[in-house]
Amino acid sequence: MDYDFKMKTQIERTKVEDLFNYEGCKVGRGTYGHVYKAKWKETSDGKEYALKQIDGTGLSMSACREIALLRELKHQNVITLIRVFLSHNDRKVFLLIDYAEHDLWHIIKFHRAAKATKKQVVVPRGMVKSLLYQILDGIHYLHSNWVLHRDLKPANILVMGDGNERGRVKIADMGFARLFNAPLKPLADLDPVVVTFWYRAPELLLGARHYTKAIDIWAIGCIFAELLTSEPIFHCRQEDIKTSNPYHHDQLDRIFNVMGFPQDKDWEDIKKMPEHHTLTKDFKRSTYSTCSLAKYMERHKIKPDSKAFHLLQKLLLMDPNKRITSEQAMQDQYFQEEPQPTQDVFAGCPIPYPKREFLTDDDQEDKSDNKRQQQQQQQQQQQQQQQQQQQQQQQQQQQQMNAEPNAKRVRLSGAGNQQDFHHQQQQQQQQQQQQQQQQQQMMFNQQQNFQRFN
């Protein structure tokens, strides 16, 4: 390309920083880049936008895919791509999209945190219904246009704040989305592992090669259950590490602990799954004989005879061929009973959820990630030290018992001394239980933060 022409084009090209104020207004980081809250410089209407800066140098395949899809997709419940900015100096790419003040990850987190203060814990029932209906509406539009989202999770379900589209759901992050208008081509050959583990359908975990729209429906079922209970239904401790092997033992174990082990009559094609042999080798049906979705939801005060449970059951059928479609789900009786779903999921009520916080330093989030990793390493080291100390104490106690058996008998012969000994044992057991509970809570919080950014 002629150098003079290149320089002239570069000067004439519209720059994102010339049109928008966004410096110091970073609001988050997604899978593919940073997100900024932006406003037009030349207008005073106060309308807010989101600028998604794609990581890397230039256009990656995932960025090209997201741009190509968003330019074609137009629906009220799918995020709108307004404009694309290319910076040739530093090879940065910016997507100008709708700005949503909230998302389901933060909304559910807000209600889960309320448990500590004994306030209202669950998301209001009417709001759950409105959220679910709009998610289904958006996914029905995608599926009708031969698009699989493939990475549905609470962090990718945005909710608009105050404004013209108040309380409207926007499905975002189309970087994993795929066209499936050529069903003979194995989609698994492109990306063997997609969708965050907690929301991944069982057929994906068993290596299905020709998966369908049903994977998005399963993820919606997981989100629905999480909205009803404020807890991820298939929470798994193991970190989400992208690999070429789709099989994930711990995630399958978690699903079976909630749903029970699938019966052959309920999922006839399970024997055709590539990882079926591994499944039969690793799991026993009898282990999960007392597990069921009804029991799990009943523990969270969702009755098995409720219409909400009946719809959830259809969304979370193990057999993808029997799983309900988005169109069928929208016609379910759950949406016919009061309260009816509303366009504003907040139903005109004040919004209780805090607005997104600014990250004034561009590297602040990366630093927080490093800090979190350092904290995790320190906690692991502390745990190892505690375990070593406990082992040393046990060894010392064992040596004392072996060296002084007679003295031990004398010390324990008195009633008062025996009570002191038992009291010490109880204190040690209580301390160990407290440490275990703290470790479990710490691991859960780490998983929540990890799942949000992946």
UniProtKB/Swiss-Prot annotation:
Keywords: Activator, ATP-binding, Kinase, Nucleotide-binding, Nucleus, Phosphoprotein, Repressor, Serine/threonine-protein kinase, Transcription, Transcription regulation, Transferase. GO terms for molecular function: ATP binding; cyclin-dependent protein serine/threonine kinase activity; protein serine kinase activity; protein serine/threonine kinase activity; RNA polymerase II CTD heptapeptide repeat kinase activity. The keyword Nucleus applies. Residues 373-400, 424-454 have a biased composition (Low complexity). Component of the Mediator complex, a coactivator involved in regulated gene transcription of nearly all RNA polymerase II-dependent genes. Mediator functions as a bridge to convey information from gene-specific regulatory proteins to the basal RNA polymerase II transcription machinery. Mediator is recruited to promoters by direct interactions with regulatory proteins and serves as a scaffold for the assembly of a functional pre-initiation complex with RNA polymerase II and the general transcription factors. Component of the Cdk8 module of the Mediator complex, composed of CycC, Cdk8, kto and skd. This is Cyclin-dependent kinase 8.
